[in-house]
Amino acid sequence: ATSTLLVSPQSLELPDAPRTGVMAQLYSLRDRGAWGIGDYGTLEVLSDSLQKLGGADFVLVNPMHAAEAAPPVEDSPYLPTTRRYTNPIYIRVENTPEYAAHPELHAEIEQLAAPLKKRNHTADLLERDPVVASKIKALHLLYTAGIGDERAEQLRAFREREGEGLVGFTEWCERAANDPALT
């Protein structure tokens, strides 16, 4: 068996000047394109806004690890089911190559997103369950419509690289989606 060993240095050099940045709970941010909860598209909007204001040396966000495979999902991003994979709630569906490749699905996906996007302009509490359910459905629609050769190769390489860990996680996701008692 092999494993990676991380060792911290005894000391670090300090930068010449203080650094400035922003810390954000990404899920709590909303922009026009978000599905009621901040996602990677929201992070892009935040980064662009910071750049226009003179820049930031860093943006610190909450953990974005995988949560439960299906609703109900844990509200806290600090209690992931695994730290190996990302949470699909943070994927901006409209920014994927598959969305661009399948305009015939845009209306159906917009129907999934529209009621969630209305929440972007309210002070209502965040509701993760409908966002997760809708994003998973949208991503499934796009995947079953077909992915391009380049993305298929990326998926093949990802599956090969992640190996048994990915197989175990996906099997657990399938079981947990059908038996909420497992989560």
Positions of PLM-derived features:
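Acidic/aromatic-lined carbohydrate-recognition and catalytic surfaces
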Residues: 1, 7-183
